[in-house]
């Protein structure tokens, strides 16, 4: 019943956003899924960040999708892993633009390097938003799987470039069951990146993790928790949907409410 209500609300929300720069039918590139209300001078090229005149109060969430296999580019249509209803509804309610950052970064022979490339892509995108008028404290990150992991790595690499973020099943280095076949990923490369992440000055993230996730269950993400620090907040549960729970979230209403509360704590 709750999911039906959320779906109906989302249909109303996104039909009402058609004049706010939604470009969901434009695939093949990074793009705005929707823009905040009443932005001036919206052009047909509104997917170009530089074409929009943001004001001092403008806010944006940068969404980062997952990576299937880092050896090859796999998101050529730039339409994989769209944000969940909970995030889109929250962004719309709070009048925050939502931007889909498409990446086809690959390892190019150096295992794990695709994550660093994705962090660089993120930094370049943030710089464009800065030039368009959005300050770092009004930039938020969100992502699924490797997109969420990219946000964690960004907390160490570019901590002053964004405010905080909401992550869904952040993961890197493949599922646990592949460890015996490809041990280098989870025994060498993942620990190396974990060491980098935990050196971050702050990890202000709301993280949704799933007990039946073959990649990272809540317990595999406990390395993020620092004593006496309120964040990151890890919300763990199971909908029997594994890694892709965020798509059909049995706790969708609670997820939405948590996201709203998390963002509202940012002096909205």
Predicted regions and their residues:
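Classical Sec-dependent N-terminal signal peptides that target proteins to the secretory pathway
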Residues: 1-20
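A domain-start/cap signature at the N-terminus of enzymes
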Residues: 17-59
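Short, surface-exposed "cap/lid" segments of acyl-processing enzymes
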Residues: 52-90
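Conserved alpha/beta-hydrolase
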Residues: 88-108
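Alpha/beta-hydrolase active-site loop
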Residues: 111-132
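Primarily recognizes the serine-hydrolase "nucleophile elbow" in alpha/beta-hydrolase
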Residues: 137-190
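The feature captures the conserved acid-bearing segment of alpha/beta-hydrolase catalytic domains
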Residues: 170-236
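C-terminal catalytic histidine-bearing segment of alpha/beta-hydrolase fold enzymes
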Residues: 229-268
């Amino acid at each position: 019943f709750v999911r039906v209500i959320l779906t109906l609300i989302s249909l109303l929300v996104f039909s009402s956003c058609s004049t706010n720069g939604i470009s969901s039918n434009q695939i093949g590139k990074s793009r705005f899924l929707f823009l905040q209300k009443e932005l001036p001078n919206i052009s047909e090229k509104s997917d170009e960040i530089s074409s929009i005149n943001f004001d001092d109060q403008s806010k944006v969430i940068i969404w980062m999708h997952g990576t299937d296999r880092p050896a090859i580019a796999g998101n050529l249509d730039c339409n994989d892993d769209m944000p969940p209803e909970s995030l889109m509804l929250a962004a719309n309610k709070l009048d925050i633009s939502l931007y889909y950052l498409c990446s086809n970064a690959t390892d190019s022979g150096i295992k794990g390097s695709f994550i660093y490339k994705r962090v660089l892509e993120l930094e370049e995108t943030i710089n464009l938003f800065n030039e368009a008028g959005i300050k770092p404290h009004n930039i938020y990150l969100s992502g699924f799987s490797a997109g969420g992991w990219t946000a964690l790595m960004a907390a160490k690499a570019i901590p002053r470039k964004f405010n905080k973020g909401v992550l869904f099943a952040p993961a890197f280095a493949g599922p646990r069951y592949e460890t015996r076949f490809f041990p280098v990923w989870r025994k060498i490369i993942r620990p190396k990146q974990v060491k980098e992440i935990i050196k971050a000055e702050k990890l202000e993230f709301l993280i949704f993790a799933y007990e039946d996730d073959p990649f990272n269950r809540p317990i595999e993400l406990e390395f993020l928790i620092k004593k006496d620090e309120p964040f990151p907040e890890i919300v763990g549960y199971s909908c029997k949907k594994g890694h892709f729970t965020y798509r059909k979230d049995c706790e969708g209403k609670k997820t939405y409410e948590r996201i709203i509360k998390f963002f509202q704590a940012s002096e909205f």
